[in-house]
Every structure is written in C-alpha cells, then in structure tokens.
Amino acid sequence: MTQQLKLTIELVPQTCWYSNLRNEVTRSTWDKIRKSSYAKYGYRCAICGGDSRLNCHEIWHYDDQNHIQKLAGFIALCDMCHHVKHIGFAAILAEEGNLDYEKLVQHFMKVNNCTPRVFEDHRTSAFDQWRERSKHNWNTNLGEYQSLIES
C-alpha cells in the first residue's frame, strides 16, 4: 500500500518548460492571480500551513495519452514546499550553493510524516515519470485562464 502524501514532487516535463500562464500574462495580471491565491489560502502555505514568503504555484494536470498539459488552478506555497514541488530545479540551486537540499528532504519528511525511504521512492518515481513525459511534445491548455492573455 502506498502512503498518501500531503506534499508531492511535481516535475514539469522538459518539453513544457516555460509553457505556463505566468510567462503569458502581464505582470499586473500575474500579481492579481498570485495575490488572489494567497488570500484564498489565508496567507499561509496550503500544504504545510507555514506563514513565510509565499509563491503562487500553477497546478497542472497531464493527459498522458493525448499529451495535453492543462492548467487546473493555483495554490499558495511557502518556499520550502515550492522547492520540493520543483525538486529538480532545487537540486541545481543546491549545487550552486543557493539552497540546502537536505533541509528540503527534511521538510518533505516532516510534512508527510515519513521516512527517508519514502522520500527516495517518491523522488525516483517522480523522475521516472518526468523522463517518460519529457519524451513527448505537449499541447498546453490554459482552460478557463486562456482569457487572461491579452492579444
């Protein structure tokens, strides 16, 4: 039986990097989206409840059959939870000396009340999925958020 995790790793396929709403809308529009997200979650991290600096994280759903990534919404995340979501990028920051990778692992284990083995298994599975998804070109569907893009 697989443990249900509160905080998960969500690696964006390499072929989808930079295909997101934030890169398509004006700064003022993105500010409205992120501030709305922060307010929705009471100015706290939606996953761990932390009240440190927040990030607006895009939630994507992937149709692995038709290779469509669809924007499903937004969630307010603290820096630690956000770095776990994007742990591949976080590893690069850690290699550059800009982030303590072990603190991210500890945060993952604390939030999920789990062992290092659970973290390692989850990370391995996430990277396996990322490698498979990165073999394909994806169509981006912004769904209800498409109208926010100025022509």
Annotate each predicted stretch with a short phrase.
Residues 57, 61, 82-86, 107, ...:
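Histidine (H) residue identity feature
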Residues 63-80, 98-114:
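Short microdomains enriched in Cys/His and/or Lys/Arg
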